[in-house]
Amino acid sequence: MSEPTKRKLHVAIITSGGAGMFCGACMHDNTWTRAMMKQGAEATLIPTYTPIRVDEQNMTGSQVFLGGINVYLNYRSRLWRRIPPFFKHWLDTPWIINLATKFGVSNDAHELGALTVTLLEGEQGPELKEIEELARFVGNELQPDIVCLSNALLSGTIKTIREHFSGPLFCVLQGDDVFLEELGEPYRGRSLELIRQNVQQLDGVLVHSDYYRDFMSRYLDLPRDHFQKVLLGIDLEGHDGTPTENPDEPFTIGFFARLCKEKGLHNVVQAFEIFHKKYPDSRLSVGGFLGKENEAYFQKTTKRLAARGDSYKYWGSPASLAEKVAFYKSLSVLSVPTVYQEPKGLFVLEAMANGVPVVQPAHGAFPELIEKTEGGLLVPPGDPRALADAWERLYLDREYRLKLARQGYERVRQFYSAELMATESLQFFQTRVDAAGFVKNEPQLTPDP
């Protein structure tokens, strides 16, 4: 008699849209979802607040839960909260939300303090009906084996989801502290207090680096054994750049990330001014999403590059994967010298995947990535001169630059593919589902009479 076929593992990931911008966390969630499906699992990506924007196949459904417009109106108006959900659902339509984001709906942390607190209050706050709708969908309709929140800012939903879903519930941390630290008081303190309370109800917290596990263990006051490190990975399809050395092409330094102060664009500009004085044939290329709240910073930071003439090029925000890959392929080296301590570093993996070495600050997750891939150099954080010196080393020693490029190119494929990420995470999830099922169905022992 043949063994019964084992049911596919079903993982539900609840992600947050980035209000019209390319968001590293939701792009990672999208890649993760698709990779698990390719491995034969069932995976559902559930968008909240706004639709997600990605440069690959979008894996989310058409319904947006906790729609940003309704969440904001619930926060602002008691009358609006009393309106039956049936009459409000049209505002959760993706094209309506996307239209609203074009007219100045902001995701700037300074403006979202009070709203963040109300969401973290969960069923005690004004978003109860929206949270209940999400929880009923997950627990009653979808009925997955695993639920994974994409960030701790969604932790206000945990208690209500628990009322409808009894399986393992996790949360991935992908830079939540960066958002929280930008909130003004009293919102920062209250938000952190609520998150610390909410995450106690989780079965575990997932992170992508040892650094972030140790940091968030202290930050959230959670024991380290409550954390699980899961592999960070990228979909390598379409990343067709290769390690090359063309002496006829100018040495081009690249910056690719959200164009804001915390990503360290000003550090790159200062370092390039130092470097370009010595090597005037060099080039600087800048690309990434520019939000309205960062336009003044961007203009002020790049204004000083006008004197460099054609040595500086602004690519804007590539609208497709092909455009992004074309940007990487034009570079000799990538540097995103973040001010904050980066928990992931997807842009590092993307650059290496296209044969481009990196020079990064020696903090956050970067040392782990550089150590494992040997695809770049580390410099002291916040030191433009050290950054320029590292570029100079690669400029003068093209063979060494090519060696780093080859090592990064090969080891990203060896250690950081989406396939490997899906395989390892599904193995972990399966063990937790099996353990939960064993405990649930284990016969109760009775004491001897």
Regions found by a protein language model. Give the residues of each.
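Carbohydrate-associated surface elements
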Residues: 211, 233
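Acidic donor-binding loop of glycosyltransferase active sites
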Residues: 326-343, 356
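Nucleotide-activated donor-binding/catalytic signature segment of Leloir-type glycosyltransferases, i.e.
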Residues: 298-322
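A conserved catalytic-core segment of Leloir-type glycosyltransferases
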Residues: 47-133
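Conserved acidic donor-binding segment of nucleotide-sugar-dependent glycosyltransferases
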Residues: 372-373, 377-384, 393-398
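A short, well-ordered alpha-helix in the C-terminal region of glycosyltransferases
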Residues: 386, 393, 400-414, 421-427, ...
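Glycosyltransferase donor-sugar binding loop
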Residues: 283-299, 314
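Conserved donor-binding/catalytic core segment of Leloir-type glycosyltransferases
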Residues: 245-263, 269-272, 285
